[in-house]
Amino acid sequence: MNTALNYQPEVLVDTADLSREEWLDYRRLGIGGSDAAAIMGLSPFATIRDLYFDKIGVTPVIEEEEENWVAKEVGHRLEDLVAMIFAKKTGLEVFPVRKMFRHPLYPFMLADVDYFIRFPDGSIGILECKTCNYNAKDKWADDGIPENYVLQVRHYLAVMNMNKAYIACLYGNNENEFVYRCLERDRMEEEELIEQEKYFWEEYVEKKIEPPYSGKPDLILASIRKYKGYADKSIPEISISSLESRSLEKYLKLSEEKSQLEKRKKGD
């Protein structure tokens, strides 16, 4: 794998004046930072099959209403505030660059970074801005960082050829309900991520081959429903793969066990 450090990211497009749909079209030209967790099977929101369908432009059979659309919208609108709080707490200069970048050695790797940081020595790093509800703050306990965010930022560091990033998260309505973590570049972790992303792009997306499902059973079931529709006994049966069948059976079994545990708990 070519992981030489003497490269500069390419600018794919200036995003300042892009519409939402135009921006999404450019994102489909490659893999973005927020896609990394799905490829690694660690996304809390989507399976690798969902990501594949999005990249090749498959329209869902059922457009399900996003349960967390408000949280996503709040997170987007508060990015500037998160950056402002981070700058105030650290004294570091932060600034946006409204461009989508591309890795020159792996052109399927894209990066649309929230903010950049200028450190006192003149070097540049990355700032990723997040929000979460108060109950989710425990995911940041003991200097922790949610794994999907770690993968997102490692992807960005690789594309931008930078060595340090901060991830900042606001979980309340004042600046004291705020955490930030530093993430240094890790070449071994980066190489593994690039290898997995390369395989996904070249073996699945470019060849139009559906990747096998993996990850949480509830996400798999939601994905099957989204792209194959609800069951209708009046129409012919559809076929699913053996892996999909096992995942569905596992999900149903776990759901039943959870239901039984909740019943016993209420009876105690």
PLM feature spans:
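Accessory terminal regions of nucleic-acid processing enzymes
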Residues: 1-268
